[in-house]
Amino acid sequence: MSFTTCILVMIGGALGTLARYVVSVLSLPISRDLPWGTILINVTGSFIIGLFGTLTLAQGRFPVSENVRLFVMIGLCGGYTTFSSFSLQTLDLMRNGAVVRAMVNVCASVVLCVLAVALGHVVAAHWNGGAVQIAQVSIEEDG
């Protein structure tokens, strides 16, 4: 773990957090019954990590350095997506007696995010010219 890598992840996280804030504010008008902004953020973030993670593998269409993958997948996507907000909003729905809406939020978030990662991977694998195993970003020591 180098200083440069830490800075890249930190900058990615800051940019992802800013993007999350902007999307949250812009989605307020549609978030009356369910926290659609958080769902949108988590689904789009899941798609981005699936797409980028596959396209940028060494055998992918756009291979990039591990630092770039860390910047996007850990920093940007980590700062952008928000499991803690999802959890708090689900708890608030349950506390307010909206148990069915809370369960819809849980099911919609989980199913849509997994589908978004899969879709991102499928699109990227197609662009790569065939099936490619999706790989997580390596967070091991830089050596």
UniProtKB/Swiss-Prot annotation:
<keyword id="KW-0997">Cell inner membrane</keyword>
<dbReference type="Pfam" id="PF02537">
    <property type="entry name" value="CRCB"/>
</dbReference>
<keyword id="KW-1003">Cell membrane</keyword>
<dbReference type="GO" id="GO:0062054">
    <property type="term" value="F:fluoride channel activity"/>
</dbReference>
<feature type="transmembrane region" description="Helical">
    <location>
        <begin position="38"/>
        <end position="58"/>
    </location>
</feature>
<dbReference type="GO" id="GO:0046872">
    <property type="term" value="F:metal ion binding"/>
</dbReference>
<feature type="transmembrane region" description="Helical">
    <location>
        <begin position="6"/>
        <end position="26"/>
    </location>
</feature>
<feature type="binding site">
    <location>
        <position position="81"/>
    </location>
    <ligand>
        <name>Na(+)</name>
    </ligand>
</feature>
<dbReference type="InterPro" id="IPR003691">
    <property type="entry name" value="FluC"/>
</dbReference>
<keyword id="KW-0812">Transmembrane</keyword>
<comment type="similarity">
    <text>Belongs to the fluoride channel Fluc/FEX (TC 1.A.43) family.</text>
</comment>
<keyword id="KW-0813">Transport</keyword>
<keyword id="KW-0406">Ion transport</keyword>
<keyword id="KW-0472">Membrane</keyword>
<protein>
    <recommendedName>
        <fullName>Fluoride-specific ion channel FluC</fullName>
    </recommendedName>
</protein>
<keyword id="KW-1133">Transmembrane helix</keyword>
<dbReference type="GO" id="GO:0140114">
    <property type="term" value="P:cellular detoxification of fluoride"/>
</dbReference>
<dbReference type="GO" id="GO:0005886">
    <property type="term" value="C:plasma membrane"/>
</dbReference>
<keyword id="KW-0479">Metal-binding</keyword>
<feature type="transmembrane region" description="Helical">
    <location>
        <begin position="70"/>
        <end position="90"/>
    </location>
</feature>
<feature type="transmembrane region" description="Helical">
    <location>
        <begin position="103"/>
        <end position="123"/>
    </location>
</feature>
<comment type="function">
    <text>Fluoride-specific ion channel. Important for reducing fluoride concentration in the cell, thus reducing its toxicity.</text>
</comment>
<feature type="binding site">
    <location>
        <position position="78"/>
    </location>
    <ligand>
        <name>Na(+)</name>
    </ligand>
</feature>
<keyword id="KW-0915">Sodium</keyword>
<keyword id="KW-0407">Ion channel</keyword>
